[in-house]
């Protein structure tokens, strides 16, 4: 099975302009993401998907591969779809979408989503990762997306709110979503063609579009957390983690 990992990277960000090139211990963040991903077993190729020449130059500077996408991409999925069309991937090729703000992603987490497709061929169209929240401050933080899933580990919903809500207790596990997706090229193209979902638009979470249109999302629970860099303050958290990693 051919497995291509794509890292979408956008220079513009309302909260943190130039985020992919922000230095973390002397390296741009996108380099940390790329190098972490390259340690995962089972990958055929890794590319950064971007529309920015500064990001392209930085990636090529450390020996990485880049696919240039349209600056008019309306969403991360549109950028991924543009990239896979340029790369000429086959319908059944597996695509891993690793968000470019995950400089501490554990390579085994990437291997987990690949393994789901290997062990359950044809049972679902999309897979992703969850992690049980241990930092209580994340429970009610809308920047940390929460998720619920059924007994067979199929996603039921994703929300910026705390879900599920315990009416009579606060002592129960809550899982957050980690920014890794896996799907076939065929599904990416079908997904990108779907109209914006009502819930997707409300929560600003693209994965809800898949659920709204009846597609299954298989979930693997990671043993490792991954810090998402949303603000300059998150850079310091990453550097502290890397100091003991």
UniProtKB/Swiss-Prot annotation:
Organism domain of life: Bacteria
UniProt catalytic activity: 8-amino-3,8-dideoxy-alpha-D-manno-octulosonate + CTP = CMP-8-amino-3,8-dideoxy-alpha-D-manno-oct-2-ulosonate + diphosphate
GO cellular component: a single term: cytosol
Pfam families documented for this protein: CTP_transf_3
Gene Ontology terms: biological process: lipopolysaccharide biosynthetic process
Compartment(s): Cytoplasm
Keyword line: Cytoplasm, Lipopolysaccharide biosynthesis, Nucleotidyltransferase, Transferase
Pathway where this protein functions: Bacterial outer membrane biogenesis; lipopolysaccharide biosynthesis
Family classification: Belongs to the KdsB family.
Record protein name field: 8-amino-3,8-dideoxy-manno-octulosonate cytidylyltransferase
């Amino acid at each position: 099975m051919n497995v291509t990992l794509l890292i979408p990277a956008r220079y513009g960000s309302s909260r943190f302009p130039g985020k992919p090139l922000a230095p973390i211990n002397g390296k741009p963040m996108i380099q940390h993401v790329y190098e972490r991903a390259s340690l995962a077993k089972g990958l055929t190729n890794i590319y950064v998907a971007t529309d920015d020449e500064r990001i392209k130059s930085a990636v090529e500077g450390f020996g990485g591969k880049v696919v240039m996408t349209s600056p008019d991409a309306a969403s991360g999925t549109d950028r991924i779809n543009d990239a896979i069309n340029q790369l000429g991937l086959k319908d059944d090729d597996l695509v891993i979408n690793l968000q470019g703000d995950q400089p501490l992603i554990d390579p085994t987490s990437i291997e987990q989503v690949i393994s789901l497709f290997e062990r359950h061929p044809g049972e679902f169209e999309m897979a992703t990762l969850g992690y049980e929240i241990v930092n209580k401050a994340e429970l009610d933080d809308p920047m940390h997306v929460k998720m619920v899933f059924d007994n067979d580990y199929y996603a039921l919903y994703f929300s910026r709110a705390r879900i599920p809500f315990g009416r009579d207790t606060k002592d129960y596990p809550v899982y957050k979503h980690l920014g890794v997706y896996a799907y076939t090229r065929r599904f990416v193209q079908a997904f990108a063609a779907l109209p914006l979902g009502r819930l997707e638009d409300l929560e600003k979470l693209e994965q809800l579009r898949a659920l709204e249109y009846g597609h299954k999302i298989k979930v693997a629970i990671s043993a490792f957390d991954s810090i998402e860099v949303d603000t300059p303050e998150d850079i310091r958290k990453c550097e502290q983690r890397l100091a003991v990693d």
